[in-house]
Amino acid sequence: MGEEFPTISLLGIDFNLSNILMITVTCVIVLLIAIICTRNLQRRPTGKQNFIEWIMDFVRGIINSNMDWKTGGRFHVLGITLLMFIFVANMLGLPFQIAINDEVWWRSPTADPIVTLTLAIMVLGLTHYYGIKMRGFKHYFVGTYFSPMKFLFPLKLVEEFANTLTLGLRLYGNIFAGEVLLTIIATQLAHMNIFVGVLAIIPALLWQGFSIFIGAIQAYIFTMLTMVYMSHKVSDEH
């Protein structure tokens, strides 16, 4: 789309200030949600406590569908954090996009492949870390890359690379495409007369609602695949 972003150079490395801002905003929102929803907890949950407990149970279900709770319980907080972080990040760029001096400052951080691929690398790195920690290096390496047959080793390496790419690029592609279409619709509305523009708002709102659905689905898929990959690394039966 030919967008430009504010950058700052530090030690010869360029940092995207828009990404830094939006990731920080996402973290603050998720933290506030967690704090607000866990204050004044009661035995009989209502309202906000119901919401956070529903998220906890939802992630628990994702984990239980991939590994036993004794093994997967330690990843419960990771799953909750990923689900909430990615969902909030996906939503930030939907209502509007802010550009100052032709530089985009406000948009979904997950609409940048650098952010999503970094997140994917971090997640896959954690699966290797816990695999080695829980199974031992030798057992982990042999069980992961030489099972069930040794000649599959090259394919297993390709699979690791492909998993990282698909995990990151799937999230990026869906969120970026949604923002592009919303931008196109908004641009077209700006050039229409008032009567046609009012009618055109309807499909714009429908697409915005669909984008919210896609953002939620992508947060779920990313969290689900994280637990799938984690189960493959930490469970002996895989």
Swiss-Prot record:
Membrane-spanning ranges: 17-37, 80-100, 112-132, 194-214
A GO biological-process term: proton motive force-driven plasma membrane ATP synthesis
A matching Pfam family: ATP-synt_A
PROSITE patterns noted in UniProt: ATPASE_A
GO cellular component, one term: plasma membrane
Gene3D superfamilies: ATP synthase, F0 complex, subunit A (1.20.120.220)
Keywords of the record: ATP synthesis, Cell membrane, CF(0), Hydrogen ion transport, Ion transport, Membrane, Transmembrane, Transmembrane helix, Transport
A molecular-function term among this protein's GO annotations: proton-transporting ATP synthase activity, rotational mechanism
Transport is among the record's keywords: yes
Cell membrane keyword on record: yes
Membrane topology field: Multi-pass membrane protein
Function: Key component of the proton channel; it plays a direct role in the translocation of protons across the membrane.
Name of the featured protein: ATP synthase subunit a
Species in which this protein is naturally found: Listeria welshimeri serovar 6b (strain ATCC 35897 / DSM 20650 / CCUG 15529 / CIP 8149 / NCTC 11857 / SLCC 5334 / V8)
Gene: atpB
